[in-house]
Amino acid sequence: MISLLQLQLRTDHRRSYVKQMRKQGHIPAVLYGKTTNSQPVFVDAAEFLKQLRATGGTGLLDAKMNDNHIRIIVRDMQKHPIRHDIIHIDFLAVDAKTEIDVHVPIHLVGEAAGVKDGGVLQQAMHQLSIRVLPSNIPPSIDVDITNLQVGDVITVSHIQTNGAYEINHDPTEVIASILPPKQEEEIHSGEEQEPGRPESEEGRETTP
C-alpha cells in the first residue's frame, strides 16, 4: 500500500502561527502546478523526510490533499542557516504524462587510474539538468571514471541516457577531469640561499 504524504491546507498566514506549527513538527510549504493554483500548505516533517530519503531526494512523491491523490516533486527547499533544518518547501504538482525539467545529482563511480598515478580528480559538475517523465526521474546519474587517465576529461556527451531522458546541457561541458600531479621542482622552485645574505652583491656600497 502506498504511503501518502498528507498535505494540509494552511489558512492562517500569521508568522506566529507558522512558528507554532514548526515547533509542533510541521514544515510550511507551497503547492503549485500547471493546473494547480498556488496553495499554502504544511506537512509533517518526519513523514516528509522519510519519503524524501526513499526517493533519493529527487523522485516522485505520492501525496494526499482534500481526499485527492496527487503526485508531486520537491522544487525547492529552504534551510535554516545555522541549524540546517528545513524551514520551507516548494512542491510542484505534476502530470505523469508530461515531461518536466529537474536537476539530478551526479555520482562519480570508481577510482580513476590517473588518481592512482598521482593525478588529482576535479569534478566540475555536480548536478545534471534533464527533461524527463516524472516516473522516470533517477535518484542520481552514475558516471564511471575508472579508466580516466591523467589529462583525460569526461564530458556530458559521455553520459548514456538510453532514451530515458534528455540532457539540458551542451555535450562539451566538462563533468570531471584528472589534473597532472604538481612537479617537485614547482613546489621547491628556486635555489636556496644562506639566510641574511642577499642573492647579489651588485650595487652595494662598501667602505674602504
From Swiss-Prot:
GO biological process, alphabetically ordered: translation
Superkingdom of the organism of origin: Bacteria
Ranges for region Disordered: 179-208
UniProt entry keywords in alphabetical sequence: Ribonucleoprotein, Ribosomal protein, RNA-binding, rRNA-binding
Basic and acidic residues bias (residue ranges): 182-208
A Pfam cross-reference name: Ribosomal_TL5_C
SUPFAM superfamilies noted in UniProt: Ribosomal protein L25-like
Family according to the record: Belongs to the bacterial ribosomal protein bL25 family. CTC subfamily.
Job of this protein: This is one of the proteins that binds to the 5S RNA in the ribosome where it forms part of the central protuberance.
Subunit structure: Part of the 50S ribosomal subunit; part of the 5S rRNA/L5/L18/L25 subcomplex. Contacts the 5S rRNA. Binds to the 5S rRNA independently of L5 and L18.
Protein name, entry field: Large ribosomal subunit protein bL25
Native source organism of the sequence: Anoxybacillus flavithermus (strain DSM 21510 / WK1)
Gene: rplY
